[in-house]
């Protein structure tokens, strides 16, 4: 009887852990399908080389979907000029910030997808500044509200650079 109860408990625990496993980057299945379709179209535009080799590596569902989103909508030059590992590093860095900051889980999925995950907004050079800035800022903002964290980042920026008109 004790063994049956123990075995049942282990099975329940395994089922629970399996259910709590990897999460989706995009929870809306229809939107996820649209991104997948757009990603496949992008792949057909660039069939030569190993530009999409990162997708042949071991990725979580979240990482795969986030990368597919980025690749589907990023400029072709960013796919050709930057490695998949670079883009994966940025996916992981953005998720780390969302997971570690107290307000990170409250950022709406579409806002995160379009304004946090992308490595750039316009045509600036891509680099690993996101990782460097996070290391420098996380302890300054981790106990603050989202609004106060935004203000603190502005203060930090003022400490680092001063605008001088040209």
Predicted region positions:
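Positively charged, low-complexity intrinsically disordered regions
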Residues: 3-4, 33, 96, 131
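Intrinsically disordered, low-complexity N-terminal segments that are enriched in acidic
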Residues: 20-98
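Bacterial N-terminal signal peptides that target proteins for export
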Residues: 1-9
């Amino acid at each position: 009887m004790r063994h049956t109860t123990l075995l049942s408990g282990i099975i329940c625990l395994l089922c629970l852990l399996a259910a709590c496993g990897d999460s989706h980057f995009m929870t809306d299945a229809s939107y996820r399908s649209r991104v997948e379709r757009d990603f496949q179209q992008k792949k057909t535009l660039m069939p030569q080389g190993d530009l999409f080799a990162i997708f042949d590596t071991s990725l979580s569902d979240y990482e795969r979907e986030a990368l597919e989103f980025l690749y589907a909508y990023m400029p072709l030059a960013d796919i050709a000029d930057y490695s998949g590992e670079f883009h994966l590093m940025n996916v992981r860095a953005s998720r780390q910030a969302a997971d570690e900051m107290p307000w990170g889980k409250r950022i709406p999925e579409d806002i995160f997808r379009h304004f946090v995950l992308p490595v750039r907004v316009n045509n600036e050079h891509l680099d690993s500044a996101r990782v460097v800035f996070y290391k420098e800022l996380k302890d300054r903002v981790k106990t603050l509200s989202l609004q106060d964290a935004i203000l603190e980042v502005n203060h930090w920026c003022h400490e680092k650079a001063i605008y001088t008109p040209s």
